[in-house]
Amino acid sequence: MKKKSSDFCLCNERKSQLSKFLENLSIDFSNFDLLNTALCHSSYSNELDQKSSNNERLEFLGDSVLNLIITDHLYKTYPNKSEGELSKARSYIVSEDSLSNIAREINLGSYILLGRGEESNDGRNKKGILADAIEAFVGAIYLDSGFSRATEFVVGLFDMYIRLMFNRGDFKDYKSLLQEYVQKKYKISPSYKLDKEIGPDHDKVFCVELYVGENFISNGKGKSKKEAEMRAAEVALKAMENINL
């Protein structure tokens, strides 16, 4: 049965869902209709015969805003890096793999409106849909709150990944690579468990364990939980082919 056009309206239940999403990210948003559009995939709007009421235009805008923010941040934060290094870093950061991983970190997929076909085909976990949605979300933040607020949001999400890249000397997103490998081979997702925290609050080290199903695979340490998870994923990915689960 075809959806009614009224299904696209921002009902109280949907607004409550979006409010929870924003609360988790500590973001204020004025225009909830704009936010709702940013999280509406074309498969959903097509079922309503409202083909323009989806996130494609916001994705177009957000792509440019995101690139400018990342370029500006890299240029100002890493004055000793060459143009080639900065270009390589930017390409990695705004890649589909990196954007989809960031989207998973903030649970963005749970709030995307999808058509029945994409819903049944696990669209919430598709890298392309997630990457497009986070670009549209950045575009919506820019329109709603301005460039400064969009910059604060983007840098807050990506800064840890950028620092890890330069510290390691490579540009691989091990969490995304591991996620893809495990899902393809075992049809499940890896999980991360905080094992312990070491040291005082001003110099804390987080220790994380990585599991595939019930099987312990690796651990990692870092100055943040995300950094520890990335390091655990790096160890796991390099060892995975030698592990018989």
Curated annotation (Swiss-Prot):
The active site is at D63, E135. InterPro entries: dsRBD_dom, RNase_III, RNase_III_dom, RNase_III_sf. Coiled coil: none annotated. One of its GO terms (cellular component) is cytoplasm. Disulfide bonds: none annotated. PROSITE patterns: DS_RBD (PS50137), RNASE_3_1 (PS00517), RNASE_3_2 (PS50142). Keywords: Cytoplasm, Endonuclease, Hydrolase, Magnesium, Metal-binding, mRNA processing, Nuclease, RNA-binding, rRNA processing, rRNA-binding, tRNA processing. One of its GO terms (molecular function) is rRNA binding. Mg(2+) binds at E59, D132, E135. It catalyses: Endonucleolytic cleavage to 5'-phosphomonoester. PANTHER family: RIBONUCLEASE 3 (PTHR11207:SF0), RIBONUCLEASE III (PTHR11207). Digests double-stranded RNA. Involved in the processing of primary rRNA transcript to yield the immediate precursors to the large and small rRNAs (23S and 16S). Processes some mRNAs, and tRNAs when they are encoded in the rRNA operon. Processes pre-crRNA and tracrRNA of type II CRISPR loci if present in the organism. Belongs to the ribonuclease III family. This is Ribonuclease 3. It comes from Borreliella burgdorferi (strain ATCC 35210 / DSM 4680 / CIP 102532 / B31) (Borrelia burgdorferi).
